Amino acid sequence: MKKSIKGAAHPAVVIVILVIVAAFALLYFIPKPQSFEGTNPLRKTGEAPILVAHRGGDGEFPGNTLEAFYNAYSVDERVIMETDINITKDGVLILNHETSLDKRTNVKGNIADWNYTDLIEQRVNFGYHNKAESEELTLFMDEYGKQIKPSDLENYPNGLEGRDPEIYLATTLEELMLAFPENIISIEVKQGGDTGLLAVKEALRLVEKYNAWDRIIFASFKDEIFAEYCRLDKSGEVPDSFMYSPSLMGAVKYVAFYVFGLDAFYTDGIAVLQIPMEEYGIGLCSKRLINNARKHNIATHYWTINDEDDMRKLIENGADAIMTDYPHKLKNILDGLEK
């Protein structure tokens, strides 16, 4: 009579477990596909992360104005400029976080219904930060409660000067590219649908005109815009240096592949993850995630980081870049690393 050992695993179960362990081990050691081919300029080259000025530094000057970007450049000449683009009725790409003018200016209406020429001729002021629930116009103030005029900007890059001492004129993407010909610029397409696709087309035209493929990042939270980036990348219509980041769902896709150990099968050609430190209670800034992205040659850029402790945590974990509304605050911390 055979004796059974109580609790002994069935051979089939053992085999299944061994197969699963072997599969995960194989996935771990398989070389990760390179999402971005060649040297990725969005990855840091030393210990310190790259400073990214969110909307030019939205806490120090009115965001998405040329003056804000001048201020950011005065803090760090290597700064990455982050901005938002919308296309006007007459086909000009202007910088603005919302698709309407209501929050940031002294006029109302969707940007797609305004001509850029009218914005300039009417001297529309982009120096406001109006509350959505109020009809009252509120001029931008810094964190100390001070109203900031363009004339308050002290340091202009060589060869450049102020446009208007009192108001913040509409800023175009082309102006930004010309003002900072050496800096990387991250552009988020804010409009969706056909209007957003028109904005992408015009941005591509400008990038081609100025041969700026190696310094423009294309971004969007709109899934249809991200799908267009993927299509352009896979179709060969853009050079290999074309850089883009995923939409929210695109980022979720990468994180899901990473969490389940399936990132060896991740094939989207993104150059950078532009993500928060946490989303839906899930931490996204661990050393492990950052290192895993690096194996795919994907840079990790975190937004919008205004707390000093968060900045230090990201530095410790090895983030490639930190996006902030306060360039001076982050620069002070980064300078402290060098001492």
Residue ranges of each PLM-predicted region?
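Phosphate-group recognition and catalysis centered on beta-loop-alpha active-site segments
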Residues: K2-K339
